[in-house]
């Protein structure tokens, strides 16, 4: 009796266990069904002729471990652990290319991503099929930060073409790619030289002074002014900008692309990124406001003045113009942030490689002495007579590749690339780092060797496969400015100083810090005046 009675609920007991178990069972059944349907969908995608790649997991795809806490990531993906925690994603993707081929794919959730790892596939996609491969992916994190405006992240189409055409022609008007910009760069170097001399023979980090100088050249074009290196607001904005680019690829921030409201979480990198955005926005909008108040239609001083005048002209012609103060803000942000960070890191890599290779540095010094001397300021007209110096800069760019995965592209329609089916809306990553370390193109690709850019007569070789600024319709708009800054600033630095690592210091890590750009790890140098 007792045993039988024990199987029945006692009198007055609330029988709630059964319904709860049914609810849990139903939820598990739905989850299992979702996983099964997702698995079937992924199998159909793989069977549709897309490029090969690692087997995705249901719901999360291949890189779902990025959404997990670090201690849970081990052995999650392909049983190999989180290798991207110790190497940059560009390096890890290059390793995957050895397994799956130069065109391979993976999934982030349901999002198909195709990686192009050799020059031929990148050229075919970005040049020969430029109209198809020139769009930008719609990602919530980028959309929140840029409102899909500006130049770098805006969608490819008539509005983007119009804005880019105006921006490029206006920058050229103020000296982009012309000798008229030289005096501004040389003038800025005088401040760099003075700052470096303050340290005497003591070790120091070259990052702040180089960042200030490069940013000021952008400021002279866009804002019509330079900022003193001691300006607290300017220094704060540069620090925020550098930090923002570094954390934008923080694995937790990827959650925003799945749940956009995560951007507003009051902790961690979410809170930090919002503060960075607020400070940079305030800085740039104040500058635009000052220009609106002082605008002289007969005497435009800089890019902002020209844009404001053009905006008014367009509004007078028609109501539906795409030129407005909001779009100006995002274009200025693109020029200021992208233009500062990439060139700053390129120059820092140059100083690091010179410090590690005194023999190369000596040859650069000798060529400068022979062509320019120690008293005259360098000029772009000297480039043709300085092939070794130019080759040295190019070799640093090849090895450092400050934008290793370019900016992601997206297909605007279904297409075929080297026999593989590429669906509409596919994210495309050109692995520029992989191209510039390709042993098929570059002999001993990991060695620092400026001579690879010189012919038997010591003259500069123009190599088609050297594409640090990308190729196609989305090629970096600031390429000409960056080349001017790199040459004039690097030659000025080499003309004035000899750079070395502090005595007894360890060799810096040369893999770089992976973010939206590949920055060198913090390092110190000593300088001796020449």
UniProtKB/Swiss-Prot annotation:
The chain crosses the membrane at residues 21-41, 99-119, 247-267, 328-348, 481-501. It comes from Rattus norvegicus. Its cofactor is heme. CDD domains: CYP2U1 (cd20666). Heme binds at residue 476. It is an enzyme of class 1 (oxidoreductase). It is a multi-pass membrane protein. GO terms for molecular function: arachidonate omega-hydroxylase activity; heme binding; iron ion binding; long-chain fatty acid omega-hydroxylase activity; oxidoreductase activity, acting on paired donors, with incorporation or reduction of molecular oxygen, reduced flavin or flavoprotein as one donor, and incorporation of one atom of oxygen; steroid hydroxylase activity. This is Cytochrome P450 2U1. Its main location: endoplasmic reticulum.
